[in-house]
Amino acid sequence: NNTLWSWGGNGDGQLGLGDTSQRNSPVQVGALTDWLYLSSGYKFGIALKTDGTLWAWGQNTYGQLGQGNTTSYSSPVQVGALTTWEAVAAGKYFVLAKKTDGTIWSWGNNDSGQSGQGNTTDYSSPVQVGALTTWDTISAGGGTTDGTCEVVKTDGTLWTWGSGGNGRLGHNNTTSYSSPVQVGALTTWSKPMAGNTFMQAIKTDGTLWTWGSGTNGRLAQGNTTDYSSPVQIGALSTWNILPSTSTAQSTGMAIKN
């Protein structure tokens, strides 16, 4: 019914309930019934409404709430006044969002260049990543100082930027990039998922691929080796859904058809 609910720790107002008290069971955030999509970072939340507006709340140390300041908010506050937001993905301390015109925007922590601006400056308001209008599916991930973005374009190409540690950007190196860089030359990518120290993606043929840190066997290659270029997980072609969350550190998950 498009209502929004939250529970758990609330020291920075990340539950959006107007206070900082812990909740041990689900509590409705306001009374609205027009919430469409939700993403959460570390102690903050950001959500899209059916009218195309974007709202954020919780911790705001790096400006990740997009308010032009670093003040924390314990109730949802609108990000600007636009009604053209279409998708949103939260990393640990930053946000990546897409508009209906196919542009992508970022703000918050930028220690590893994850804002895609060609620098490592933090931004407390949305800034456009390049000038392209052909971005399709977005994902954001990474930890405290190693944020990453993974995005598929409408032409099926895959692009990544941010921290390159463990080869997590898929460029056959461990270099960090502060602007989008294409992963290989393929045009068959469909669904991305940026984790904490690794990435996953599904191709249009239903195969599942991964790269980055292999610690704990999270790349499903039968070992704990790091891979700096995409490697296929098994031989199946029936993978369909990746997690909407992008904060996974030690585990990989996917759903088959």
Predicted regions and their residues:
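Conserved core positions of repeat-based scaffolds
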Residues: 6, 44-47, 56, 75, ...
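Blade-level signature of beta-propeller repeat domains, shared across WD40, Kelch, NHL, RCC1
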Residues: 226, 241-257
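Short loop/turn segments immediately following the C-termini of beta-strands
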Residues: 9-11, 43, 50, 59-61, ...
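Short glycine/serine- and acidic-residue-enriched loop/turn motifs that recur at repeat junctions
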Residues: 5-24, 57-74, 107-124, 161-178, ...
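Tandem repeat domain/solenoid detector
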Residues: 1, 34-37, 50-53, 84-87, ...
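Short coil/turn segments at the loop-to-beta-strand junctions that recur within blades
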Residues: 21, 32-35, 71, 82-85, ...
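Surface loop/turn motifs at the tips and blade-to-blade linkers of beta-strand repeat domains
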Residues: 29-30, 79-80, 129-130, 183-184, ...
